[in-house]
Amino acid sequence: METVRQAARRALEDRFEVLLAGEGGQGLILAGVILAEAAAVHGGLNAIQTQSYGPEARGGASRSEVIIAKGEIDYPEVMTADLLLCMSQEACDKFYPKVKDDGCIVVDSTNVSRVPSHRAITVPISHIAEEVTGRRITASMVALGFVGGLTGVVSKQALEKAVADRAPAGTEEMNLKALAAGFAEAERLRGDGNEPLCA
């Protein structure tokens, strides 16, 4: 069986599809933009980001789709995700069927109590954000760091540069701190070469 990182590297040869899903106000649209820019502007890869959200400013459904590839990207939306990030129960219930058989589901255990698959990796993302920055809104940056550290698809340096470029003025340091906490959680989980298996 492949580790998450091995599967991500293999998928990147064709296209690595990421679906970030949750509620409006969680910062997932910005997280998707940062992930795409980290890959394309700072990582030398091709990337496309699309987004969708409900009419509510906060609390409605929100998702950001990011396709990353070494070659050209011929279709701009996620068909079957290599990685699904669920930041709400509704997102988890709705989108887990869109994950590839050998794909990975990362769940914010702070907000999701019913995990639909034994393949899911549960992480208290929102709790970590509150602990590290005192702001729950930075959970999307914790999640981005965790996804980056888990998959290795985009380097930590590329993500840091994209966060510094895109974070709202005056919040760069806080967002970089949240990103670092996500990477640290991925490292803690991977431990001594004990990488998670999603398949």
Question: Whereabouts are the PLM-identified features?
Answer:
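Active-site cofactor/cluster-binding pocket
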Residues: 1-199
